[in-house]
Amino acid sequence: TPGSQPQPMDLRVGQRPTVEPPPEPALLTLQHPQRLHRHLFLAGLQQQQRSAEPMRLSMDPPLPELQGGQQEQELRQLLNKDKSKRSAVASSVVKQKLAEVILKKQQAALERTVHPSSPSIPYRTLEPLDTEGAARSVLSSFLPPVPSLPTEPPEHFPLRKTVSEPNLKLRYKPKKSLERRKNPLLRKESAPPSLRRRPAETLGDSSPSSSSTPASGCSSPNDSEHGPNPALGSEADG
């Protein structure tokens, strides 16, 4: 071209950068409508997306209802299954319920640690049941009525006498007296009667009969009671 300046020669050794040739005017005229068409296409797509957003938002609320229906269907299937055919894979509903139970237990444990004195489970007060009245009514329905006994006993029905404590003491007193040890100084009942001694005679009164018969001085009470002394009888005869 007449207006172009001469470019210096590149004397560098190695890989040379590629130099794009300047675009020709014919190519520029062809690229302009393509760019315009592309711009219009992108603008149409953006408008379609904006118009589709309200429709998508209007269709979003039914999704939870569909999920609830699916959960109910899964629960029914689990209930209708036999125990032998139940699978070990837990469904999403079961997992959710397990997570809720675990969270409740963790919260209860935290409350116990924070407030140990307060009871974790509120107990309700139970009223006392009238078991005696119910038992009596049931027994009265099965058993025949018992005639009421009179308060005062009749004359032909004597009361049984019981042994009182003083009577027992009197009954056992003789046994205690028998068991006692007797006095050893007392004379036995089985022993023979004691011999009676004659009174001492005066010194001046000394008879030959008394000296000749020494046995006459000591006489047994049995001899004096039953009969005369044989020695005295012989002296009288002589």
Curated annotation (Swiss-Prot):
Responsible for the deacetylation of lysine residues on the N-terminal part of the core histones (H2A, H2B, H3 and H4). Histone deacetylation gives a tag for epigenetic repression and plays an important role in transcriptional regulation, cell cycle progression and developmental events. Histone deacetylases act via the formation of large multiprotein complexes. Involved in muscle maturation by repressing transcription of myocyte enhancer factors such as MEF2A, MEF2B and MEF2C. During muscle differentiation, it shuttles into the cytoplasm, allowing the expression of myocyte enhancer factors. Keywords: Chromatin regulator, Cytoplasm, Hydrolase, Nucleus, Phosphoprotein, Repeat, Repressor, Transcription, Transcription regulation. Its EC number is 3.5.1.98, 3.5.1.-. Transmembrane segments: none annotated. It catalyses: N(6)-acetyl-L-lysyl-[histone] + H2O = L-lysyl-[histone] + acetate; N(6)-acetyl-L-lysyl-[protein] + H2O = L-lysyl-[protein] + acetate. Interacts with HDAC1, HDAC2, HDAC3, HDAC4, HDAC5, NCOR1, NCOR2, SIN3A, SIN3B, RBBP4, RBBP7, MTA1L1, SAP30 and MBD3. Interacts with KAT5 and EDNRA. Interacts with the 14-3-3 protein YWHAE, MEF2A, MEF2B and MEF2C. Interacts with ZMYND15. Interacts with KDM5B. Interacts with PML. Interacts with FOXP3. Interacts with RARA. The lineage of its organism: Eukaryota, Metazoa, Chordata, Craniata, Vertebrata. Residues 176-190 have a biased composition (Basic and acidic residues). May be phosphorylated by CaMK1. Phosphorylated by the PKC kinases PKN1 and PKN2, impairing nuclear import. Phosphorylation at Ser-164 by MARK2, MARK3 and PRKD1 promotes interaction with 14-3-3 proteins and export from the nucleus. Phosphorylation at Ser-164 is a prerequisite for phosphorylation at Ser-190. One of its GO terms (cellular component) is cytoplasm. It comes from Rattus norvegicus. Belongs to the histone deacetylase family. HD type 2 subfamily. The gene is Hdac7. Its main location: nucleus. It is found in: Nucleus; Cytoplasm. It is an enzyme of class 3 (hydrolase). This is Histone deacetylase 7. One of its GO terms (biological process) is cellular response to mechanical stimulus. Residues 1-26, 47-72, 145-238 are annotated as: Disordered. Residues 206-221 have a biased composition (Low complexity). Residues 58-158 are annotated as: Interaction with MEF2A. The modification Phosphoserine is found at S118, S164, S190. GO terms for molecular function: 14-3-3 protein binding; chromatin binding; DNA-binding transcription factor binding; histone deacetylase activity; histone deacetylase activity, hydrolytic mechanism; protein kinase binding; protein kinase C binding; protein lysine deacetylase activity.
